[in-house]
Amino acid sequence: FDVPVSGTHAHSWIMSFPDEYTAFKAYADIYPNACLLLVDTYDTLKSGVPNAIRVFQEMKEAGIPLTKYGIRLDSGDLAYLSKKARKMLDEAGFPDAIISASNDLDEFLIDSLKVQGAAITSWGVGTHLITSKDCPSFGGVYKLAAVMGKDGNFIPKIKLSENTEKVTNPGNKKIYRIYEKESGKIKADLICLADEVFDENEPMLLFDPLEPWKKTKLPAGSYTLRELMVPVFLNGECVYDSPSVMKIRDYSKKELETLWPETRRLVNPHKVYVDLSAKLYDIKISLLDQMSAE
């Protein structure tokens, strides 16, 4: 996937040597340009950090450039230990030494550590990143939205439910993302019928699909539109060129910048609205009225 790989050594590396210092020295000899030492195998502040400092001093005296070096904390009170370790490293003359932290970190722990003033410069996130721990499954079911009539036109269909959020949106549809023109931030996503065309120089009316009394009117010229859906398969043939992992990452980072700060906050975030066009809303209400009359 052309993704750069980096990391440190394991506790087993330390334990395979007679003592911690010898293990650190051997690792530094092998990786002098990427010397990140795991300091919590025995005692972080009494032996781990002092032994790491000893190795760094020896590298410095030997004329080895200290380009990328530091320590990793993998247990204990990371806020407290990082502050103590930072003080020890600074006093020893290594103010640019990296302090990396790991140990089942997620976005909430990282945010908490930052609030506590933890002296951590690098975050190692593994388990929570690769396992989708907070949401391990994606709930999705097939629902019919439209059938093609004999004349070639789609006939919209709707499914009702005791749960409002499970009532489907009828018809053959497409999706636009609406951006506020002034800020470039996302205003809402718009679900509309596949044949609808919009003019950014005309006002637009949006309907909340769950709370239809909530309407948003966008003034003409105040927004821009981008269609989100692209063809992947046409007539059984794949017509989509999958981008590289790095391009996907770049796209994701770019799109994240279009979210409002209130949407990106970890606690009680504001939501991105997904609305219906006036035409789709009218069809949905019409079908609901028909179903309730039967």
Briefly describe each language-model feature range.
Residues 90-92, 97, 105-294:
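Gly/Ser/Thr/Ala-enriched C-terminal appendages of enzymes
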Residues 1-92, 105-115, 129, 150, ...:
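Buried, small/hydrophobic-residue-enriched core segments of structured protein domains
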Residues 102:
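Short hydrophobic "strand-cap" motifs at the C-terminus of beta-strands
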Residues 83-85, 99, 273:
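A broad "ordered helical/assembly scaffold" signature
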Residues 3-7, 34-37, 69-70, 97-99, ...:
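Structural motif
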